[in-house]
């Protein structure tokens, strides 16, 4: 089961990378066509941006994400012995290297894992989760995060985060160029465009508008699916579903975070902003907490 899940996540990583390139290519073509009168130029800029952003995220993802979420790193066990040893124990049970450990100064209880692979992983917890949870509950939470590390979920989420951020940046770049350029392409089309050109223009604009939404939906779907798997993985590591159940109940009954970055919301064990759930759940970063707890109770 475990090795099948790791292999599946590695395949999903390739699929997400392919989607990343395809979406960026499409948005690049659209931005180039609408704003610069050259779809090919837009495509080249998008591909260059994709390569740069992927290299940056893969090589620097941990530091970037931790900086965005105001995490401070523990460098040795003496910095926080209890947290350090819980992470160390769970890493040993999960058979993964000891990850880097960070603390986020925030009263709301929450935690997340990030990185590129088990050899370059990091775990962050808030001061709020340390204050409210017992050791048994903390083991359940850290076991959940170690499952993300062990199953290569962290790589999948790093790529999804890059996908969402890069497309948003490309759209913003195109819109800024449009406004500063005075909408030159639109005026040219108004003067000498035919019906087909107008249709292409409308289609390109629709693509530009919907691309960030599509990227966000992919990221959210990935996040929802991985939370169920990590919950089950935590129980496998700790042999104690009650610890995680109690932890999730306390996390759910808390105030929103202040230090969390919106683009990292999907990484956390629970939605850090306590956003109202949509009835379709398409726009939710996490599955309903009640469903997660019910599944754990049925194990």
UniProtKB/Swiss-Prot annotation:
Q: What Gene3D superfamilies does UniProt report for this protein, alphabetically? A: Metalloproteases ('zincins'), catalytic domain
What GO molecular function terms would the record report? Answer: metalloendopeptidase activity; zinc ion binding
Q: List, alphabetically, the GO terms of the cellular component aspect.
A: plasma membrane
Biological process GO annotation list? proteolysis
Where exactly are the transmembrane stretches of this chain? Answer: 16-36, 38-58, 159-179, 198-218
Residues at the catalytic site: 145
Q: Which HAMAP family match?
A: Pept_M48_protease_HtpX
Designated name of the protein: Protease HtpX homolog
Which species is listed as the source? Answer: Lactiplantibacillus plantarum (strain ATCC BAA-793 / NCIMB 8826 / WCFS1)
């Amino acid at each position: 089961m475990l090795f099948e899940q790791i292999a599946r996540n590695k395949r999903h990583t390739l699929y997400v990378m392919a989607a990343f390139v395809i979406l960026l290519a499409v948005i690049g073509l659209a931005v180039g066509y609408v704003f610069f009168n050259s779809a090919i130029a837009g495509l080249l800029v998008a591909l260059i941006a994709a390569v740069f952003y992927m290299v940056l995220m893969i090589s620097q993802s941990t530091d970037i994400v931790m900086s965005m979420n105001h995490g401070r790193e523990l460098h040795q066990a003496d910095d926080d012995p209890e947290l350090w040893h819980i992470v160390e124990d769970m890493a040993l049970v999960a058979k993964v290297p000891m990850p880097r450990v960070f603390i986020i100064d925030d009263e709301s209880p929450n935690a997340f894992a990030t990185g590129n692979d088990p050899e370059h992983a990091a775990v962050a917890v808030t001061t709020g989760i340390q204050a409210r949870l017992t050791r048994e509950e903390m083991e359940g939470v850290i076991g959940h995060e170690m499952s993300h590390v062990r199953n290569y979920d962290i790589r999948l989420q790093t790529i999804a985060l890059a996908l969402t951020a890069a497309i948003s940046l490309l759209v913003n770049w195109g819109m800024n160029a449009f406004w500063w350029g005075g909408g030159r392409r639109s005026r040219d089309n108004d003067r000498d465009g035919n019906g087909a050109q107008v249709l292409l223009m409308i289609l390109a604009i629709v693509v530009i508008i919907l691309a960030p939404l599509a990227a966000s939906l992919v990221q959210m779907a990935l996040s929802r699916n991985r939370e169920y798997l990590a919950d089950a993985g935590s129980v496998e590591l700790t042999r104690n579903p009650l610890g995680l159940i109690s932890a999730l109940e306390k996390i759910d009954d808390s105030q929103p975070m202040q230090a969390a970055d919106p683009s990292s919301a999907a990484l956390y064990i629970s939605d850090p902003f306590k956003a109202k759930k949509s009835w379709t759940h398409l726009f939710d970063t996490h599955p309903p907490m009640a469903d997660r707890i019910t599944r754990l109770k049925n194990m």
